[in-house]
């Protein structure tokens, strides 16, 4: 199983061996193959959240080339569409899938491509979403749609979104948008979400800045 509330897909591992407290960075093996690295653990419950092999491979690839470009950052906040009353309000059918866009930064890649708050994303690159915003990956099984535009994509890649937008008459109109992924949701933020990546432009010495 996978978590669906994280920026990236994580393995949710149940282990018969009690994980070490604070055991981040421990290997997660399947057979004789490395499939992940632990990010956090819950020893009493014998559960571990682990970074996937996909992300590990991306970091290793960029380390070899010396060209770190990171992962796309869209900054989009979404919610699932399991409530039939909410679906009816949006002009959607009782069945079907997708996720509802709650809000997104105006400097992010999704907004620049035309996505707006209130839109419903029904598929990514032609892959349909269920009502919880999950896709059926042939190798990983049910996984968050984030996997398609965060985990497995690179800045500069283009994805295609099939969306629905509620019109003034209350009906839901289909649209197709192409999104060129980038990191503008981070780079355009006034508050640096990752201050540890670079040194601050000041020095504190003896109480003086």
Predicted feature locations:
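Extracytoplasmic
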Residues: 6-10, 23, 46, 71-73, ...
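PDZ domains, with a preference for the canonical peptide-binding region formed by the helix
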Residues: 53, 123-162
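Terminal peptide-recognition signature
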Residues: 24-32, 37, 48-52, 59, ...
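Solvent-exposed coil/turn segments that connect beta secondary-structure elements
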Residues: 1-2, 33, 40-42, 54, ...
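PDZ/PDZ-like domain segments forming the peptide/carboxylate-binding groove
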Residues: 14-27, 79-123, 127-130
């Amino acid at each position: 199983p996978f978590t669906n509330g994280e920026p990236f897909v994580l393995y949710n591992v149940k282990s018969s061996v009690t994980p070490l407290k604070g055991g981040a960075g421990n290997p997660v093996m399947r057979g004789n193959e490395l499939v992940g690295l632990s990010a956090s653990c819950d020893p009493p419950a014998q559960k571990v959240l682990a970074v996937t092999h996909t992300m590990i491979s991306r970091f290793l690839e960029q380390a070899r080339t010396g060209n770190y470009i990171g992962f796309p950052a869209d900054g989009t906040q979404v919610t699932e569409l399991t409530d039939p009353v909410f679906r009816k309000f949006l002009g959607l059918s009782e069945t079907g899938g997708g996720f509802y866009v709650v809000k997104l930064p105006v400097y992010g890649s999704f907004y620049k491509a035309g996505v707006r708050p209130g839109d419903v994303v029904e598929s990514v690159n032609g892959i349909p979403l269920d009502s919880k915003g999950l896709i059926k990956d042939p190798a990983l099984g049910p996984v968050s749609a984030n996997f398609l535009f965060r985990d497995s994509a690179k800045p500069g890649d283009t994805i295609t979104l099939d969306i629905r937008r509620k019109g003034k008459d209350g009906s839901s109109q289909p649209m197709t948008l192409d999104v060129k992924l980038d990191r503008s949701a981070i780079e355009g933020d006034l508050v640096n979400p990752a201050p540890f990546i670079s040194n601050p432009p000041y020095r504190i010495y003896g109480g003086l800045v």
